[in-house]
Amino acid sequence: TYVQMLTENTPNIRGLAQAFGMEYIPGPWMDAIQVSKGTSSVLNGYEAIAGQINVEYLKPQTQDPIALNAMISTETHAEVNVTGGWDLNDKVATGILFHAQNMSLELDHNHDGFLDMPKNTNVNLLNRWYVKTGDYTGQFLVRGLYDRRQGGLTKEATSALSPYKIDLNTWRVDGFMKNGYVFDADLGTSIGIITSASYHNQQNTYGSRQWNAAQTNAYLNAIFQTSFDDSATDLWDDHHHNLSAGLSFNYDGYNEAIRLIGDEAIR
């Protein structure tokens, strides 16, 4: 894709997660969606060509203490969301976001023997922390995810010796740490360090073929910012001279195995 997908300004939706990545972000978890056009700034990532889409999760210091919503459709799509944020004291806040959904009914409205849409089970749990002490601000987040999708022939159409079935199983864990320190508020002199990591594991079956894959990602972004003049009322107006410098590091490690059922794996 030419558009870089970010969560909390970290390149979280990439590689193996790109196929269903946006579905791993439940709507009730979103605090804001930020869209930019054109090539990206190195401040938030250098991989975008046509633009960036950044999703901000609910913040524990501003979200409701508890919020619950649940739904079920006529086609047995059931979903529940629980979110909550609490101020532990005047410096520390924490929040929990939970999502679960299940679609277990086999739908074949055109009666061709294949599922119109995959059966799906998804469980998603996130915990984040916010710390503010003096000139230091820190944010910490960890999330775990399980997702299963089943498609192919319906039960009524599986009389064949080798019925075509699709079974996608995904386990994922990711998280980040954001640390920022302000040295001079008048000049806007500060340093920010973002680190994130993720592990994504997929075990998939497509008929008589299996494709298993795992991805490990590590990301580091460190930015130093300052202004050369404290006379303006707005540190970032058009008449102010500012400096932003830093470094960015991104690592992806992949491990894949493809085989026919009963054969040795090809890695």
Language model regions located:
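Signature of Gram-negative outer-membrane beta-barrel scaffolds
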Residues: 236-267
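Short strand-turn segments of transmembrane beta-barrel domains in outer membranes
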Residues: 34, 39-41, 52, 57-86, ...
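Transmembrane beta-barrel domains of outer membrane proteins
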Residues: 36, 56, 83-87, 97, ...
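Short acidic/polar hinge/loop motifs at secondary-structure boundaries
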Residues: 10-37
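Flexible loop and strand-edge segments within Gram-negative outer membrane beta-barrel domains
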Residues: 103-126, 130-191, 197-217
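Short loop/turn motifs that connect adjacent beta-strands in outer-membrane beta-barrel proteins
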Residues: 44, 60-65, 90-92, 134-137, ...
